[in-house]
UniProtKB/Swiss-Prot annotation:
Biased composition (Basic and acidic residues): 727-738
Protein EC: 3.6.4.12
Chain ranges for the short sequence motif Arginine finger as given in the UniProt record: 477-480
Protein name stated in the entry: DNA replication licensing factor MCM3
Binding-site residues, ADP: Q353, L393, E394, A395, A397
Record-listed Phosphotyrosine modification sites: Y708
Chain positions with Phosphothreonine modification: T674, T713, T722, T725
EC main group: hydrolase
Keywords for this protein: Acetylation, ATP-binding, Cell cycle, Chromosome, DNA replication, DNA-binding, Glycoprotein, Helicase, Hydrolase, Nucleotide-binding, Nucleus, Phosphoprotein
InterPro entries given in the database record: AAA+_ATPase, MCM, Mcm3, MCM_CS, MCM_dom, MCM_lid, MCM_N, MCM_OB
PANTHER family (alphabetical): DNA REPLICATION LICENSING FACTOR MCM FAMILY MEMBER, DNA REPLICATION LICENSING FACTOR MCM3
Source lineage: Eukaryota, Metazoa, Chordata, Craniata, Vertebrata
Residues found modified as N-acetylalanine: A2
BP GO terms, sorted: DNA strand elongation involved in DNA replication; double-strand break repair via break-induced replication; mitotic DNA replication initiation
Amino acid sequence: MAGTVVLDDVELREAQRDYLDFLDDEEDQGIYQSKVRELISDNQYRLIVNVNDLRRKNEKRANRLLNNAFEELVAFQRALKDFVASIDATYAKQYEEFYVGLEGSFGSKHVSPRTLTSCFLSCVVCVEGIVTKCSLVRPKVVRSVHYCPATKKTIERRYSDLTTLVAFPSSSVYPTKDEENNPLETEYGLSVYKDHQTITIQEMPEKAPAGQLPRSVDVILDDDLVDKAKPGDRVQVVGTYRCLPGKKGGYTSGTFRTVLIACNVKQMSKDAQPSFSAEDIAKIKKFSKTRSKDIFDQLARSLAPSIHGHDYVKKAILCLLLGGVERDLENGSHIRGDINILLIGDPSVAKSQLLRYVLCTAPRAIPTTGRGSSGVGLTAAVTTDQETGERRLEAGAMVLADRGVVCIDEFDKMSDMDRTAIHEVMEQGRVTIAKAGIHARLNARCSVLAAANPVYGRYDQYKTPMENIGLQDSLLSRFDLLFIMLDQMDPEQDREISDHVLRMHRYRAPGEQDGDAMPLGSAVDILATDDPNFSQEDQQDTQIYEKHDNLLHGTKKKKEKMVSAAFMKKYIHVAKIIKPVLTQESATYIAEEYSRLRSQDSMSSDTARTSPVTARTLETLIRLATAHAKARMSKTVDLQDAEEAVELVQYAYFKKVLEKEKKRKKRSEDESETEDEEEKSQEDQEQKRKRRKTRQSDAKDGDSYDPYDFSDTEEEMPQVHTPKTADSQETKESQKVELSESRLKAFKVALLDVFREAHAQSIGMNRLTESINRDSEEPFSSVEIQAALSKMQDDNQVMVSEGIIFLI
């Protein structure tokens, strides 16, 4: 505060006169005179002034305003009140004070919470950041009026503290007695209060230095500025930077607390928008028309070019970046347009790398991990302010990523309670808090891209997908697509991957020096609340395709062009704005395919669903088809979009399950060998050959082979051949014998008579054979008895276990 200049009355009046001349610009363009008239008609009391206009008209006064804010703003606000009174005297008397808010170019005083240092104290600064904490709105007394019944006099007292522009704070003692110790009564109707709120602004994650904690600054909002921002909003706050003395035990300590007293709060765009030129728009239109047939495949191939394969996953991530169409119906229902994807698979299949690519490509993305995140850390938390002791709301990762993407790695490491906390966010797109006396609803309209490992560490192909995934159905149904990514052993594919990885390690970007760290920043920041000096000089010509590099893209016979990352960002940004409409043809096709999906699990026995097919799947098909239409820059969702969406869902929802060969049980060595032992061994050899061929073909299809499965080698090891018993031979033969209807009916009648005579629910096989054939004219052979019992067991009429027949 050493640099602060206290103005005397003469200088204050001179400053007030300069500001009044600036506002009274009727002879010039009349901008601020019309603004003041609008302020009166809108019943407002804060005028937004552009610093550039003041600098153009009175540069000396503008510099003083930025460097000695408190006294200059007091003079500016008095001048504003005088100017309002000259236009409408009655309106000027309605409000105690009129406020001035600033905008425009602040140059070196346009800072972030990290660069806001002590040299800016008592200056006007513009701070950018994300609102992370938000206190409750409290009333603060400005003027209290007290009535003394004994003397019948009225006493008035004004209050000011260090958060106001007045240089010296008044006494905070609330009067209860007058000078003669007569009791006073407070006239609450005549007293004046103003709203007061404290928010905390944190620096933006994309601008924070890597490996350092983000810094924050407290901002004080008064009167009409309260509730201008909520947790998760990106804002620019213009205000005066001030230090407040810290007190401990009634004494002022040497450490000071700094706050920003706001005079203007401006909402920034939710997205970090890329800057567009007319040429960029023309290129985007031309690209969408010339590549209209395979534009979706072209864009999907260009996603994460450093990752080999995973074509369907890349298509799904492109759909996630484009998104569907969000709808709010008249009855209050909300249909989300965000697409959620879960990647589950073996280690080292590039799940985390895909997440990192989305972080770099999406306009707004926040990374988090399952082990390092809690449920309230992802949604919102109610915390206690250490200084005031009051409750405040703190936004989590999903609220901060509103209209963006949340990337959650190691999703399986989260606890069930924390995973349950994100259910509402994934479907409704909002967070509802009702705890500690705070009831709030925050927007969290974000897409979720999660990566997880299977339950057993690696994916077991002999178990169903649901057993491998190990997540609740209620959570899985909220993911639009669930991809199972396997590390399969295929010599040809392994050769391609090794070639690809080696090329990536040999590649070096142009101009990269030895040992240089890769730059993490983006384009040049604009040090103003607006971008008035936008020119084409800063714009580089955005190339549609990347220049082909043999190391980066490989030497293929058919050179596939890769869309550049810069053009991809701009194309996705433009495509997201389009809102396609479903055609009748595509709607009918989606409805038919949805009903087919519901019954598809009963068609083939060797496939199983990765996630439940519910009504949400129908919305998934619509969202994916809409995203495909956005990629084509189409205003309608056509049949080809619906077909592509169905193909994605078919690939993601069903996974083949292998059947394990039953291992033979070892029998005792003293059992005699049967005559057909040699034939059996030959059959086994043939079956093994067939199985090996089948598995090799499956591996080529990319569907079944597991590099850690040694079932083939186990079967090829020498095994002890076990002889067949007579019972097993009869059982096999009984499956070949077919009983006639009359013969089966006679057996059932005879069986029922045997159970009635025995007065029991179970009977042995030997006893049954004797009892049935005792009085029978045509006795039943043991093979017929086995066949009849097998038939009755299939019909759930009897149960055979260890030679005992149970009547059901």
